[in-house]
Design a protein with these regions (language model features):
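Extracytoplasmic "Venus flytrap"
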Residues: 37-56, 60-64, 70-84, 88, ...
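Flexible loop/hinge segments that line or gate small-molecule binding clefts
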Residues: 105-144, 152-155, 162, 255-265, ...
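Short, solvent-exposed amphipathic alpha-helices that sit
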Residues: 49-63, 145-149, 173-193, 207, ...
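Hinge/cleft segment of the Venus flytrap/periplasmic-binding protein
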Residues: 34, 173-174, 185, 189-192, ...
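Hydrophobic alpha-helical
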Residues: 91, 97-116, 182, 201-262
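C-terminal motif of bacterial Sec signal peptides marking the signal peptidase cleavage site
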Residues: 19-22
Length: 317
């Protein structure tokens, strides 16, 4: 009898230890119904493009429920070092998923490797990295969008003349791809167009204005500009307006904002290639959610573009 009691006592202790250890090893993230923490890191919190990404993500989070969305962005304009620090913070805070719009194709790749090592799903938004350390990538087909801008631009300037180009950041995959697409198409269909200057504004409107003013001053016979992001587009549009050249200097830009709508309406901007940043944020959250729930997702998603002019401006109002 005593032996039986000892066996029962031993089994009771063993069962208790098993329960304690199993509870200790279980975290919030182990339960499919536990609240999840998603971190969204964009290039800045100034351009309407990134605010649209944020709005899309917020709306999807509300729809899904039980998700905390943390929005992070450098205080000023693009800062890859600050983005890296924010991503490392998200890893340390045990984020369940990270959505990242990398401002530098190379500089953000090392932290992407850390995210992968931490077994955290990484969804790239808008821009690429130089490695394959991500789970999904939602973006415009930027090279094709650049080609579309080139076709539009060539028609506006009748296939000839001097032009300037203003991008945001030289190391951003979006600027690289859009510039490549634009220049390739121009060489193909309008070889008499001469690119006299390619400059970078860091997406800052005031800097883009100064750059465009200098280019027009140095080239009085300039026929137009191509700009590959919202900040550059608005800065160049303001320079064209300030110099009274909206009838002689054609501008084809990128992105949608209240400022681009006004520039289309006042004639300083002739066309803008409009992306779908809201969809990037909205679908990005859904993809992260699906990955966490064991579902397969498409790795590359083209979120599409439209060329908007004064004639079809209602589609972005």
């Amino acid at each position: 009898m005593r032996k039986l009691n000892l066996i029962i006592s031993f089994l009771t202790i063993l069962l208790a230890l098993t329960l304690i250890l199993s509870c200790k090893g279980k975290t919030k993230s182990d339960s499919p119904n536990a609240s999840k923490k998603f971190v969204l890191i964009t290039m800045d919190s100034i351009d309407e493009h990134w605010l649209s990404v944020k709005k899309g993500a917020e709306d999807k989070v509300k729809e899904l429920g039980n998700i905390e969305l943390i929005f992070r962005a450098p205080a000023g304009k693009t800062d890859p070092n600050e983005q890296t620090r924010m991503a490392e913070d998200a890893i340390n805070q045990k984020a369940d998923a990270i959505l990242l719009a990398p401002s530098d194709i190379a500089a953000l790749s090392p932290v992407a490797a850390k995210i992968k090592e931490a077994n955290i799903p990484l969804i790239l938004i808008d821009s690429a990295i130089s490695t394959e350390d991500y789970d999904a990538f939602l973006s415009t087909d930027n090279e094709a969008a650049g080609e579309l801008a080139g076709e539009t631009f060539a028609k506006l300037v009748n296939g000839k003349g001097k032009i300037g180009i203003v991008h945001a950041q030289p190391a951003a995959s979006t600027a690289i791809a859009r510039g490549k697409g634009f220049e390739t198409k121009i060489k193909e269909i309008a070889p008499d167009i001469k690119i006299v200057s390619v400059q970078y504004s860091d997406g800052d409107k005031a800097r883009a204005l100064n750059i465009a003013t200098d280019i027009m001053t140095a080239n009085p016979d300039l026929v137009g500009f191509f700009t590959s992001n919202e900040g550059s587009t608005i800065g160049v549009a303001r320079a064209i307006e300030d110099m009274g050249k909206k009838d002689t200097v054609m501008l084809v830009g990128f992105d949608k904002s209240q400022d681009t709508i006004r520039a289309l309406e006042n004639g300083t901007l002739k066309a803008t290639v409009v992306q779908n940043p809201y969809k990037m944020g909205f679908d990005g959250v859904q993809m992260a959610f699906d990955i966490l729930n064991g579902k397969k997702v498409e790795r590359l998603i083209d979120t599409g573009v439209n060329v908007v002019t004064l004639e079809n401006i209602d589609i972005i109002k």
